[in-house]
């Protein structure tokens, strides 16, 4: 069975060593595995949320495209495209926006962080917040759901957005699927072994901290940057502490286990920091020199990059265009020539009811959700060690087993046989919480024939 994997990088800056080791290199390696259908894209619509400098965005698109290819991505074996070359994505974003609950988007980490910062500074909670920032998770959901990605490699700060994509896709399926699921429900993939590299000052390597080492800068500039890596004051001949040395962490991310063990031993034996920095430069230059040359060749031939990306977009649209047509049909955006006429003769839709949805969580445990008739989540179960246990509780609730709803602040818990088995969402006020409890009681009430 083929697994579809999707990865995007926002085009707001020049790729650095941290981007390469943390995202680009592992993604390229994953694309070379058997049984994988990989989609890689330049998230240039997302870039507009954070950056209003057109020249910077244009330059970053070029640099990131060249970086993927110079790093070893084979465009003939993957689908490689620019987000902005797929017009179906913004259209799908709107379809999903129309079913995405505002309360769900209110809980997005990036939006909440902006609101919290504004409140802390005594400003209006939404000061400086654009609709782009607020609805960013819906655009990300469209990126994922457009191609029915099964797995989405992300950093821990992005797990919530993949979960939101699941929720939005699930709600669309419920409202318009009529027994069919249009969208596969994606899973976030966290690579525990992926490196998070320190920058020149020891903090996480980030453009925000101005502490990066550009990936394909010249050998001279790379050597100069490495010379500025902060180290302790231990002199040559004094034993160094590799586990607390940022320079060693960088070396470890690019070396073989044998090279790393040898470098560790040299530091313990008193290798001077100047010599250690020279070792790091030699390691990086040896790995990146050929890729650097290819990168600069690509940068010098932007028309070739354009052709590669347009070919990837054409490949992606062979999937996106017919799929969006199905979605348009599902929501009622149909041709008047269609044999199915939206007239009074069409039978009234069958009344939708609440439903239980089982799934397996990232940690391998089993859980279930209870969705209301409109697709809103009413309950999220606690974790169960196996599917049988989760299914038994779900079945007992569906059969009208005596459940006890207990209010917990602006949320509530569901108890069964003296044990808490599920939790409700966190609500903005008591009225919304009480309305949800009413819907829950109706959903769990035994059905009369």
From Swiss-Prot:
Catalytic activity: tRNA(Trp) + L-tryptophan + ATP = L-tryptophyl-tRNA(Trp) + AMP + diphosphate + H(+)
Residues annotated for ATP binding in this entry: 10-12, 18-19, 155-157, 197, 204-208
Annotated Gene3D superfamilies: 2.30.29.80, HUPs, Tyrosyl-Transfer RNA Synthetase
E.C. number(s) listed in UniProt: 6.1.1.2
Residue ranges of coiled coil: none
Motif position, 'HIGH' region: 11-19
GO cellular component terms listed in the entry, alphabetical order: cytosol
Keyword Protein biosynthesis: yes
Subcellular location: Cytoplasm
Its job: Catalyzes the attachment of tryptophan to tRNA(Trp).
Protein name: Tryptophan--tRNA ligase
């Amino acid at each position: 069975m083929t697994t579809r994997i999707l990865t995007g990088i926002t085009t707001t800056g020049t790729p650095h060593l941290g981007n390469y080791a943390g995202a680009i290199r592992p993604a390229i390696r994953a694309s070379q595995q058997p049984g994988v259908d990989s989609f890689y894209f330049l998230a240039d619509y997302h870039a507009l949320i954070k950056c209003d400098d057109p020249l910077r965005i244009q330059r970053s698109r070029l640099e990131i495209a060249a970086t993927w290819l110079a790093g070893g991505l084979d465009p003939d074996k993957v689908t490689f495209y620019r987000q902005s070359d797929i017009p179906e994505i913004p259209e799908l974003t709107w379809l999903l926006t129309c079913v995405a609950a505002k309360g769900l988007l209110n809980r997005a980490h990036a939006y909440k962080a902006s609101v919290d910062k504004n409140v802390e500074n005594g400003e209006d909670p939404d000061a400086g917040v654009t609709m782009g920032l607020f609805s960013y998770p819906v655009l990300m959901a469209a990126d994922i759901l457009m191609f029915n990605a099964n797995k989405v490699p992300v950093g821990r700060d992005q797990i919530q957005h993949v979960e939101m994509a699941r929720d939005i896709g699930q709600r669309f399926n419920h409202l318009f699927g009529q027994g069919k699921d249009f969208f596969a429900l994606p899973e976030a993939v966290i690579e525990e072994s992926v490196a998070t590299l320190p920058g020149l000052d020891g903090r996480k390597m980030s453009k925000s901290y101005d502490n990066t080492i550009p990936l394909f800068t010249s050998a001279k500039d790379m050597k100069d940057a490495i010379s500025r890596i902060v180290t302790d004051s231990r002199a040559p001949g004094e034993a160094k502490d590799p586990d607390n040395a940022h320079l060693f962490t960088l070396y470890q991310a690019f070396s073989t286990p044998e090279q790393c063990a040898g470098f560790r031993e040299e530091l313990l034996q008193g290798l001077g920091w100047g010599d250690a920095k020279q070792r790091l430069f030699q390691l990086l230059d040896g790995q990146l020199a050929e890729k650097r040359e290819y990168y600069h060749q690509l940068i010098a031939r932007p028309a070739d990059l354009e052709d590669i990306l347009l070919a990837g977009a054409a490949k992606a649209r062979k999937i996106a265009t017919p799929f969006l047509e199905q979605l348009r049909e599902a929501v009622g955006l149909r041709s008047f020539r269609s044999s199915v006429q939206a007239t009074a003769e069409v039978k009234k839709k069958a009344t939708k009811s609440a439903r239980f949805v089982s799934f397996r969580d990232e940690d391998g445990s089993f859980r279930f959700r209870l969705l209301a008739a409109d697709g809103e989540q009413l309950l999220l179960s606690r974790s169960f060690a196996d599917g049988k246990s989760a299914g038994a509780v779900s079945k007992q609730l569906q059969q009208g087993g005596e459940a006890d709803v207990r209010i917990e602040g602006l949320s509530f818990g569901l108890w069964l046989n003296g044990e808490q088995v599920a939790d409700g969402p966190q609500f903005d006020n008591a009225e919304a919480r009480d309305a949800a409890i009413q819907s829950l009681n109706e959903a769990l009430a035994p059905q009369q024939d």
